Amino acid sequence: MAEPYLIEKLQSVEQTFQDLTRRLADPEIATDPREFQRVARMRSSMEELVTTYEEWKQRDAELKGAREILRESSGDPELREMAALEVNELEALLVSLEERLKILLLPRDPNDDKNIMLEIRAGTGGDEASLWAGDLLRMYSRYAESQGWRVKLLSESTGELGGYKEAILEIQGESVYSKLKFEAGVHRVQRVPATEAGGRVHTSTATVAIMPEVDEVEVSIDPKDIELTTARSGGAGGQNVNKVETAVDLFHKPTGIRIFCTEERSQLQNRERAMQILRAKLYEMKLQEQQEAVSSMRRSQVGTGSRSEKIRTYNYKDNRATDHRLGLNFSLNPVLEGEIEEVIQACISKDQTEQLAQMAQDQEAAKV
């Protein structure tokens, strides 16, 4: 039998779902398209939970019936065996449905459906760190392609021997943030650099930041805080390259954030793109503050998404990628080729398990 607090929550969601269904059937709402869309989205977000709860109620009723038959079938061994088998199957199914219901009841991250900007910065390790940042960019590009997402390079600062000192990708598609948010943090590589004549293993790092895309309404920027200069672009631009100042160098005075955009074809487009990146960076800073406040109350083992948190080590000698949050090893080569879905799903599962444990703990505390 599901815990009483779970039943109460499910009944409350079911009631809200029914209220929203009636609201959508009201002819008056058709006169306000924006309100209609808002209500329809809310109802849609609850549909899987309500459908699963309906199935749970149906199976729970079937279990009660099967147990009743089991009690009354002492004189019929064949019927008793069938009833016992059905009871076992239904009990297992109800446990599975209850776990699913708990996961569906977890609060949803409002950013999960958003597109992202993925920033990779070379850390310790000099030229080798830049090469490693380039390898990570390739890994994420490959993974994004496997998911059917669209990838575009927005900004780059190349390393002297290749790779990137810094690069920003725009990744668009279904539920991008919900998966890649677990990739934020420090990625450490242990390998013999191509520049190392002695064959010694070096350790280098690169930091990954995952920034959900935001609009102007979500982040307000005072124009007085922006210092903007232009330069000749060395990027796309055809006949305009090095003749017209299409590149934009944007500096945000309060935070010290500097963004250099050259990838678009006009100065206006590069300015808009730089502002878009700035909004995402400022929003991510706000998210970091919120997550640090939450993590002080609930220390997540999956990770806080902090830029300073070492999340994974890629060891070339042992052909092993170790995720430190999970305490699990993965084969290195497939991971570097972008086959990281297994890692990400393991992070999602662990995060859900932690949230469920916190939910149960909160319920116990409420009883005291």
UniProtKB/Swiss-Prot annotation:
UniProt-listed Pfam families:
PCRF, RF-1
InterPro entries this protein is in?
PCRF, Pep_chain_release_fac_I, Pep_chain_release_fac_I_sf, Prokaryotic/Mito_RF, RF-1
Keyword vocabulary terms for this entry: Cytoplasm, Methylation, Protein biosynthesis
**GO CC terms:** cytoplasm
Q: Which SMART domains match?
A: PCRF
Q: Where in the cell is it found?
A: Cytoplasm
Q: Which domain of life is it from?
A: Bacteria
One MF term in the entry's GO annotations:
translation release factor activity, codon specific
Alphabetical list of PROSITE patterns matching this protein: RF_PROK_I (PS00745)
Q: How is it modified after translation?
A: Methylated by PrmC. Methylation increases the termination efficiency of RF1.
- Keyword Transcription regulation among record annotations: no
Query: In the record, which positions carry N5-methylglutamine?
Result: 239
- Keyword Protein biosynthesis attached: yes
- Quote the function comment for this protein: Peptide chain release factor 1 directs the termination of translation in response to the peptide chain termination codons UAG and UAA.
Q: Record's family?
A: Belongs to the prokaryotic/mitochondrial release factor family.
Q: Which NCBIfam families match?
A: prfA, PRK00591.1
Q: What is this protein called?
A: Peptide chain release factor 1
Q: Which organism is it from?
A: Synechococcus elongatus (strain ATCC 33912 / PCC 7942 / FACHB-805)
